[in-house]
Swiss-Prot record:
[4Fe-4S] cluster 1 binds at C131, C136, C142, S375. The keyword 4Fe-4S applies. Belongs to the radical SAM superfamily. Lipoyl synthase family. [4Fe-4S] cluster 2 binds at C162, C166, C169. One of its GO terms (molecular function) is 4 iron, 4 sulfur cluster binding. Transmembrane segments: none annotated. It comes from Ostreococcus lucimarinus (strain CCE9901). Its main location: mitochondrion. This is Lipoyl synthase, mitochondrial. Residues 145-364 form the Radical SAM core domain. HAMAP family: Lipoyl_synth, Lipoyl_synth_plantM. It is an enzyme of class 2 (transferase). The keyword Ubl conjugation does not apply. It catalyses: [[Fe-S] cluster scaffold protein carrying a second [4Fe-4S](2+) cluster] + N(6)-octanoyl-L-lysyl-[protein] + 2 oxidized [2Fe-2S]-[ferredoxin] + 2 S-adenosyl-L-methionine + 4 H(+) = [[Fe-S] cluster scaffold protein] + N(6)-[(R)-dihydrolipoyl]-L-lysyl-[protein] + 4 Fe(3+) + 2 hydrogen sulfide + 2 5'-deoxyadenosine + 2 L-methionine + 2 reduced [2Fe-2S]-[ferredoxin].
Amino acid sequence: MRAVLELTRRRARNARFARARAVVGARARAADAQELRDDSKGGSSVDKATSTAAEARETAHTLEGFREALRHGPGFDDFVRGDVAYSVPAPKSLKDKTTRKPAWLKREVPGGERYTEIKSKLRELKLATVCEEAKCPNLGECWGGGDGKTATATIMIMGDTCTRGCRFCAVKTAKAPPPLDKDEPANVSKAIAAWGLDYVVLTSVDRDDIEDQGAGHFRETVQRLKASCDVLVEALTPDFRGEKHLVELVATSGLDVFAHNVETVPELQRDVRDRRANWDQSIEVLKHAKKSGAKITKTSIMLGLGETHEQVVNALKLLREADVDVVTFGQYMRPTKKHLAVVEYVTPEAFKRYQEIAEEMGFLYVASGAMVRSSYKAGEFFLANVIKQRKAKEAAAAN
C-alpha cells in the first residue's frame, strides 16, 4: 500500500513538472514568434522600438515562466532521494544581456585598392592603427578618400598595449607593455608621406609605465610629420595623469588640433573609464592645451551607456565652459562580451537633437551620429577647411 501511495505522489510531481516546463516553452515560443513578426515589419522608425520591446517582452515571459517552474519544481528531499530527473533551463535574458543592433548600425565590409594599400604599408612598417585595434566600423570609409573626400587614417603610436583598462575599450592591456620603438616617429612620417593623406590623427595608448608617459615620443612624432609632408595633424592624447607640463609638451608640438576624449558624462565616469581617469582631470587637460596655444580643442562622448538627456546637455555646458571647440557623439558598440553591455541604441533623431543643442551652444563643429567616432572623416573634412582658411588669413595679415 505504501509503495502504491509513493508511486502516485511521484506521478503527480512529474505531471506538475511537465506542466511547468510546458509553460516555459510556450511563452518562449510566443516571444520568438512576436519578435519575428516585428522584424518582418522593417523600417528604421521602428527598429529601436522593436529591439527594446522584444527584449523586454522576452525578459518578462521567460523570467515569469522560470519562477513558476521553480515554484512547482522539486524540493530538497526530491533531489536527495535522486528519484526525479528534472531541470529548468535558465531564461535567455539571464544568460545573455546582448541588445540586438538596429538596422541603422550596419556597415559594409571594408575593402578596395586604397584600403589594401594602407593596410599593407602598416604591416611593412610595423605600425598600429586605432581603426583596427578598436574595431572601428568606419575603417573602410575613412581609408578610402578620393573624389574630393578627405583621406584619413588614425595611427596609434607607443605600441598596441595600454597600461589602463577602460571598460569600453578593445585595446590590449598590461602593467608593463614593451618599450617604445625609437624608430616609430620616423616610420610614421614615412608612411604618411607615401600615402599622401590630407589629415592624420595620431593617438596612443596610455603609458603610465614611462616617466613622461610618452609625451616626448608624441611630440617628436608630430614634429617629424609636419617636417616631412603637408598634412594636417590631430593629436588625440591620453590624460598624462593631468600633469600640465606633459600636456603642454604635446600642445606646443606644431599640431593643428588637440583632442582628448572625456568618453562619457560626468556621472558615468567611474563605471566606464579606468579608475585613474576622471571628468575633472580630462577637463583640465583640455583647458591647459588651449591655454598653451592649441588653436582647436576637441573631445568625444559615447552614447548608449545609460546616460540621461539632462546629463548629456549638462556635459555639453561644461565643455563649452572649458572652451572646447569641437565635440563628437557616437553610439557605444560593445567590442566583446567581456566589455560593458550596451544599455540603449540611440535613435538617429536623438543624435540629431544633440547636434542641434551643441551647435546652439556655440561649438565650432559638431559631428553626431550612431557611426561617428572621435576621428571620423566627415569631421576631419570640415576641420581641414577651417584650418586652411585660418592659415590663409594669418598669411594675408602677415603680408
